Structure formats: structure tokens, C-alpha cells
Amino acid sequence: TSHYAGIKVINMEIFRDGEVIGYSNYFFKHGDNTVEIKNYTQFKVKLFGVVIFSISSEAHEKYKNDELIYFKSNTFQNDKEKYVNLYYDQTKNKFIIDGSSFKGEANTDSIIGNWWNHKILKAEQQISPLSGSVKGQVVTFIGKENIELYGKSYLTDHFKLKSKNQDLPNDKKLDFDIWLDKKNNLILKVAYTRMGEWEY
């Protein structure tokens, strides 16, 4: 998180099949050896004018000396409530998770699966920011790539992030293309396919 010392806001538009359908915005508050990040995510997928999939989510995470100590989120997915309450237990040196799809412990090298944090590309496990589930992941470096965003060209490192367990059902599998700006360690773009072509 020290890489993000000067950053106050990261705004991400969410595209599906080339059309903007929502946003995921991160707001940073820096203190003495602490960082707090608030995230607001909203999008709706419509088919013939009818909403077939929607997310409305708020999350709050806290870091002390670059280490995650707290995460809380509330999400409505198609009006179904999901949640995560996570805290760091110093005596066990573990994350304690109370989530809508997982209750238990996770190793402290697990990363919350949020796109502001480039450390997701180094982690072996990610914790779902919506439900608290813990998934093993494998990250592969594809190569250097020039990409264009909003009329600007960026030299990026292109990575593929996939689930370690390939036996998971397709809707539970991790399968993302991620483009990282190595200069400032910011993830510039994320793409995946699920009910259409998605980009953040």
C-alpha cells in the first residue's frame, strides 16, 4: 500500500460488450502508517430493457504498516445480500472471516480480490470482496503490451489470473486478463468473459 501514498482516488468504469454499465471507485485516506480504502461499485446488465444482473456494493478496508487488518463489505447481487466481515487476529496470525459464503480462517498472505491492489498479481490466494470465499489462484506473465485507454498509450505488463482448482463450476472460476502499468504499479485494465465481454 506504500506504493499508493500519493493516490486519493481510483475511478474505474465498467464496460460490458463495449458499453459503460457502471463503475467501481476507490477512495484512499492516508494516516500515520495506515491507509483506509472505501469502494463503491454499481452496475446493471439489461436485456430488452429488463435488468438481468446487478451489483450494488460498498466496502471498507484498513491497512497498518502495509498489512491488511480489517475488511468489511455489503453487497446486493440481484437483490440477494452478500457480506464479508474480516479482521486480523494477532495471536493466531490469521485472518478471521465471517462471510456469506465462507466462515473460517485464511493465511495472511491472502489478498482481497480488489483491482486497486497490484499485490493480487503476487498472491497465491484471493478472498472474495463480495462473499469472503477463499480461492487459490495462478498468475502467469503473458508479455509486455501497448494498450490505449482514453486516447493515451501505455506500455503494460499483461498477466493471466486463473483459479488453481480448474474443477470449479465456470461461474465460480477466476479467469482474468490484467494489464499493469509497472511504472506506478497501477492495474490499468481488467478483462474477462461471463455473459458477455467485460472490462474494468
Describe the role of every protein-language-model region.
Residues 2-89, 119-200:
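Acidic, serine/threonine-rich low-complexity disordered tracts
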Residues 71-113:
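Hydrophobic, well-structured mid-protein blocks that either form specific transmembrane helices
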